[in-house]
A protein has these predicted regions:
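Glycine-rich phosphate-binding loops of nucleotide-dependent enzymes
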Residues: 1-178
Length: 178
């Protein structure tokens, strides 16, 4: 990010922000409500266009690109509130995230390869939802939905993973498990 400024009708959400990341690097952005943390992620993912500045990923400018095209470049995001397919099972949610290429026909025909099934099983263990594999995602607790969405993001194998408040709304026990 180079000199990113975002102004909403005169309110400066971000003011001349600069940030660079290297492969494998982990960063946490901490601040009070309204400090611009989500706006910062929105700029990277194309949800918000900055008033000024540039965003580069893999040497390409992200400014003006559509959100889905930024995702295809390898940018994955988990939002504050869990966004899972509530009418699908936990397993089906994960099948969507690990299917490659992202083809509706692959999903309809259930063309999931053995290595993808192994990946789903691994992700289920990571999020401790193996016993809920056939449960509808809508029946999960808020915390379990958060975990499922994180697993879905991991299953996509993004080159850049943006996670916005992953423990928001979790109980103390769920936060400790996370």
């Amino acid at each position: 990010l180079e000199n990113i400024t975002v102004s909403f009708e005169g309110f400066l959400a971000l003011n001349d922000l600069n940030l660079s990341l290297r492969k494998g690097e982990l960063r946490a952005v901490i601040g009070p409500n309204g400090a611009g943390k989500t706006t910062f992620l929105d700029v990277i993912t194309g949800k918000v266009k900055p008033t000024k500045g540039e965003v580069f990923f893999k040497g390409k400018s992200l400014i003006g690109r559509k959100e889905h095209k930024i995702a295809r470049l390898g940018v994955g995001r988990k939002f504050q509130s869990p966004r899972v397919f509530e009418n699908l099972t936990v397993k089906e949610n994960l099948e969507i995230s690990v299917s490659t290429p992202k083809s509706p026909l692959n999903l309809i025909n259930k063309k999931i390869k053995n290595d993808q099934l192994d990946e789903i099983e691994h992700l289920m263990k990571v999020i401790n939802l193996s016993k809920k594999i056939n449960s509808k995602a809508g029946a999960l607790s808020h915390g379990q939905k958060q975990w499922l969405e994180i697993a879905m993001l991991l299953g996509q194998k993004p080159d850049l993973m943006l996670v916005d408040e992953p423990v928001a709304g979790l109980t103390d026990e769920e936060t400790d498990l996370t």
